């Protein structure tokens, strides 16, 4: 029975996290996997090639060897492990699960800040720091989505929690009170 993408990501992501923890390299692995994820997303053909059943293991290994230079021995071992089990088609999902485990272990939140206009990095960081402090997180990594329909303010979606401080939401509340 084939594993689902989610189950594959969970199993391999957990195994990689445990391996990194046992070797005392969780931060290094996090950093390198994050870098690798960005590279793979910028060049998705990399995963497609290493997942291609037409290429034999030796060809895939030589391609991987060329790419893994500059990464730690631990990450190289992980990449070779994934290659040997033919799991490169799940690479981004596996990395995402590792990041999820790392963030949970280190009390780091992730979320989205929806704003009407794009904030500068400093504004976004101040918002993240404020939220992290209020909710007991060590850090918060926020992505920004611009949504002109919220008119102004910000809608924060963090770890399943939504805080709607948008002008649109406030106007809807006023409208609801007036129509009662």
UniProtKB/Swiss-Prot annotation:
Membrane topology: Peripheral membrane protein
Superkingdom of the organism of origin: Bacteria
Keyword Transport: yes
Main location: membrane
Compartments in which it is found: Cell membrane
Keywords, comma-separated and alphabetical: ATP synthesis, Cell membrane, CF(1), Hydrogen ion transport, Ion transport, Membrane, Transport
GO cellular component, one term: plasma membrane
InterPro entries assigned to the protein according to its UniProt record, in alphabetical order: ATP_synth_OSCP/delta_N_sf, ATPase_OSCP/d_CS, ATPase_OSCP/dsu
GO MF terms held by the record: proton-transporting ATP synthase activity, rotational mechanism
Record function comment: F(1)F(0) ATP synthase produces ATP from ADP in the presence of a proton or sodium gradient. F-type ATPases consist of two structural domains, F(1) containing the extramembraneous catalytic core and F(0) containing the membrane proton channel, linked together by a central stalk and a peripheral stalk. During catalysis, ATP synthesis in the catalytic domain of F(1) is coupled via a rotary mechanism of the central stalk subunits to proton translocation. This protein is part of the stalk that links CF(0) to CF(1). It either transmits conformational changes from CF(0) to CF(1) or is implicated in proton conduction.
Subunit structure: F-type ATPases have 2 components, F(1) - the catalytic core - and F(0) - the membrane proton channel. F(1) has five subunits: alpha(3), beta(3), gamma(1), delta(1), epsilon(1). F(0) has three main subunits: a(1), b(2) and c(10-14). The alpha and beta chains form an alternating ring which encloses part of the gamma chain. F(1) is attached to F(0) by a central stalk formed by the gamma and epsilon chains, while a peripheral stalk is formed by the delta and b chains.
Descriptive protein name: ATP synthase subunit delta
Organism annotation: Lactobacillus delbrueckii subsp. bulgaricus (strain ATCC BAA-365 / Lb-18)
Gene: atpH
